[in-house]
Amino acid sequence: MVINFAAGPAKLPEEVLKEVQENLVNCNGSGISVMEMSHRSSNYAKIHDATISDLRELLNVPSNYKILLMQGGGTGQFAAVALNLIGKTGTADYVITGSWSAKAAKEAAQYGTVNAVLPKLAKYTTVPRQETWKLDPNASYVYYCDNETVEGVEFDFVPEVPAGVPLVADMSSNFLSRPFDVSKFGVIYAGAQKNIGPAGTTVIIVRDDLIGKHLKITPSILNFEQMDKNNSLLNTPPTFGIYVMGLVFKWIKRNGGVAGMAKLAAAKSKLIYDTINQSNGFYYCPVDVNVRSRMNVPFRIGSASGDDALEKEFLSKAEAEGMIQLKGHRSVGGIRASLYNAVTLAETQQLANLMLAFYKNNKN
């Protein structure tokens, strides 16, 4: 058996994969695969609309928010957010706490003035407290990344922003892993390939008063107004990905909803962080305790800077036991265990057991 700890594209629930397998050739009795369905057909419309409806239910999305299903991933939204929102004042505030928020700020700077509200961090291992932020009350929006996948930094609070300034969150890697109040945000987006489906679809939740404020140069494919007017069917959507995502939403509903996912995430991440904390420094996680991600757990082995030989040996032993894709991001090295919604508690326990055994065999 293989246990997939990939950072994305990531593990999908086995139940969902089996359902996809059963319906692959003949989807819902239609006689054809969902991959062959016209996106304008009634068969596909049922899938598309149910996916949006189930997401609205899972997050209690208020009626004045639109749900869009777009393409281009998170990187596409780095541009789309700026193109659709920055025109209000020409400036935007960016809270840069990791690789992805840094990339988003760089992209947005092509379309307006970006204000970095934090001093440049030497290392992405913390979220400075809000009282140190330099927010501009004239900003078109405030942008942050709720969970930095590479560095394993996850916000433990929702930022407070100046009155009238919309809050924008990239939730690509922790979407549907904990409840949150949608009404605190102007825009929320998430690439599907971490927690909610295969790569290719990006979910956008946008407050309706922010639609229609785009720059003239905004391409139709990134235009929130165009996508909203066309029910996300402006062009051919990633129909198969949306179908699978819809099945994941139903799986979440069957398994305690978003609150159920949050409970599971807390239990799984505690297993790994407890193992790290009880290893007398053999395992080392550089991230401040209060913002350690429940989704992505990065750590070094042997010391704070890592022992290359030990880390290679650990990865080899993990693979021999069926645990794959544990290598850390190339920019930070070490090990990274991604514990998205589909990863089970039992699978996480197997990783914790391996870590404990490896520690006992290799500690000085």
From Swiss-Prot:
Q: What is its EC number?
A: 2.6.1.52
Q: Which residues bind pyridoxal 5'-phosphate?
A: 74-75, 100, 149, 170, 193, 235-236
Instruction: Identify which cofactors the protein needs according to its UniProt entry.
Output: pyridoxal 5'-phosphate
Question: Which GO-annotated molecular functions does the record name?
Answer: O-phospho-L-serine:2-oxoglutarate aminotransferase activity; pyridoxal phosphate binding
Entry note: cofactor: Binds 1 pyridoxal phosphate per subunit.
Q: Which Pfam families match?
A: Aminotran_5
Q: Where does tissue-level expression of this protein occur?
A: Expressed in ovary and head.
Q: Which domain of life is it from?
A: Eukaryota
The enzyme's main class, written as a single word, is transferase
Using the record's annotations, give every residue carrying the modification N6-(pyridoxal phosphate)lysine. Answer: 194
Binding-site positions, L-glutamate: 40
Q: GO CC annotations? A: cytoplasm; cytosol
Q: Name one GO biological process term.
A: L-serine biosynthetic process
Spell out the reaction equation it catalyses.
O-phospho-L-serine + 2-oxoglutarate = 3-phosphooxypyruvate + L-glutamate; 4-(phosphooxy)-L-threonine + 2-oxoglutarate = (R)-3-hydroxy-2-oxo-4-phosphooxybutanoate + L-glutamate
Disulfide partners? none
Q: What does this protein do?
A: Catalyzes the reversible conversion of 3-phosphohydroxypyruvate to phosphoserine and of 3-hydroxy-2-oxo-4-phosphonooxybutanoate to phosphohydroxythreonine.
Q: Which HAMAP family does the UniProt entry name for this protein? A: SerC_aminotrans_5 (MF_00160)
Instruction: Report the family membership.
Output: Belongs to the class-V pyridoxal-phosphate-dependent aminotransferase family. SerC subfamily.
What is the recorded name of this protein?
Phosphoserine aminotransferase
